[in-house]
């Protein structure tokens, strides 16, 4: 009987532990969802930096302006607040594809891709068995925001969609994203699919380092040639208002970007622009509509170009508010991967980290015996005198040898003569 009681207690204990574990997991999964759903107004945190230019009041729930060179946020309104990204997710899909594939590869569509085709989501009407180049797939991914293409790219690159999603999350962590979790390659709604304006700017910044990525993300038009199952060409034109030349929201210097929308995410927008050698990235999330997102992004770009400049520092440059010089910055030296890195701060705000170039030893100048230390031309007579002195100095040892030999010979002669004289005297007096 005691054995049965002991067994019952054991089973009950295991049951309690199991239920507790389930509750913990559920709570963990619900944390991100709660963070997204419980939206509260957020402030512009960069406005709290002493001496920092006041940033614009954008109407998007969150937004950032990033210096693409340093990765520094020049403006942040809820930059680390979790939101649903929608189709700006495809920026990461594009990045992984160009990093892992040739644009000439053929992509064969399966049920994986075609299942995501619906009348109310972006697509180009691909069919099972249809073949398209990776190049065409990527332009369709960005310009048309085709969800079935995103899913098929994921399967093609990762082997399975899930493995590709794992690649997305691993790459995000490598880039430095701290509040991002992907569950699909398209950005279709899912409670566990989320990111932040800051993290999306980091992903865009990483992508801009890749020439293929940069070319595709900045395309306004592309024509997909007829395929094995479609005799018609598919003509694509950008939906990004700041990139489209005909748009009233077109921004001069726009490099490219990606739009996004779902009812849960609202309108999301990622944009890069370059002027006067400076590239900025803006991200706005949960805007009321695309016009608002574009207006907010334009305000952020204008804020950046009007209020900041580049300051030259040892080994590179950092963005600083107008009127601020290197003398106003604080430098903190540290080591990263065996290299010396200088962190530059303005009123305790990190502006950027610059790797310090290794100092190259300066060779000492060769001493020229004929040169004039006064900087003028050496007189030829002085050169001749110097040469004469060198010849005299060189001849002294030879003369000394000769004199020593003569002196020794004379001494020996004196000794011989002295001995001979002594013998004669002995005979004389003897």
Describe the role of every protein-language-model region.
Residues 2-12:
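Bacterial N-terminal signal peptides that target proteins for export
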Residues 4, 74, 395-399:
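Catalytic-site microenvironment of enzymes
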Residues 18-29:
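C-terminal segment of classical bacterial N-terminal signal peptides
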Residues 10, 14-18, 409-412:
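Hydrophobic alpha-helical membrane-embedded or membrane-associated segments
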Residues 27-198, 202-211:
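Active-site-adjacent loops and short helices of periplasmic peptidoglycan-processing enzymes
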Residues 177-178, 189-430:
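Domain-terminus/edge residues, biased toward the C-terminal soluble/receptor-binding domains
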């Amino acid at each position: 009987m005691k054995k049965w009681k002991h067994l019952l207690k054991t089973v009950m204990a295991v049951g309690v532990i199991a239920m507790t574990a389930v509750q913990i997991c559920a709570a963990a999964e619900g944390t991100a969802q709660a963070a997204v759903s419980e939206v509260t107004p957020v402030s512009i945190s960069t406005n709290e930096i002493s001496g920092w230019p006041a940033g614009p009041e954008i109407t998007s729930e969150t937004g950032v302006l990033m210096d693409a060179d340093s990765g520094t946020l020049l403006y942040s309104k809820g930059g680390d607040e979790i939101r649903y990204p929608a189709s700006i997710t495809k920026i990461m899909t594009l990045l992984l594809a160009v990093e892992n594939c040739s644009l000439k590869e053929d992509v064969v569509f399966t049920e994986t891709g075609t299942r995501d085709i619906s009348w109310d989501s972006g697509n180009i009407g691909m069919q099972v068995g249809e073949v398209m180049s990776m190049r065409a797939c990527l332009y369709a991914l960005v310009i048309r925001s085709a969800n079935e293409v995103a899913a098929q790219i994921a399967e093609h690159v990762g082997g399975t969609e899930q493995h590709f999603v794992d690649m997305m999350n691993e790459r995000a962590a490598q880039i430095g994203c701290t509040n991002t979790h992907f569950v699909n390659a398209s950005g279709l709604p899912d409670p566990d699919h989320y990111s932040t304006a800051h993290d999306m700017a980091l992903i865009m910044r990483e992508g801009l380092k890749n020439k293929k990525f940069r070319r595709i993300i900045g395309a306004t038009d592309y024509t997909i040639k007829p395929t094995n199952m479609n005799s018609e060409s598919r003509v694509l034109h950008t939906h990004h208002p700041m990139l489209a030349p005909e748009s009233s929201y077109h921004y001069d210097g726009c490099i490219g970007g990606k739009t996004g929308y779902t009812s849960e995410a609202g309108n999301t927008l990622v944009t890069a622009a370059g002027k006067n050698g400076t590239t900025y990235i803006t991200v706005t999330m949960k805007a009321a509509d695309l016009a608002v997102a574009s207006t907010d992004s334009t305000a952020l770009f204008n804020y950046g170009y009007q209020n900041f400049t580049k300051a030259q520092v040892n080994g590179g440059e950092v963005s600083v508010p107008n009127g601020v010089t290197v003398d106003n910055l604080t430098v903190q030296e540290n080591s990263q991967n065996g290299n010396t890195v200088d962190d530059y701060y303005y009123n305790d705000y990190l502006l950027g980290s610059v790797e310090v170039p290794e100092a190259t030893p300066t060779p000492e100048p060769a001493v020229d015996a004929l040169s004039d230390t006064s900087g003028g031309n050496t007189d030829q007579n002085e050169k001749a005198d110097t040469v004469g002195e060198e010849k005299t100095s060189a001849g002294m040892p030879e003369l000394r040898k000769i004199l020593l030999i003569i002196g020794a010979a004379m001494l020996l002669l004196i000794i011989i003569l002295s001995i001979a004289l002594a013998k004669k005297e002995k005979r004389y007096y003897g």
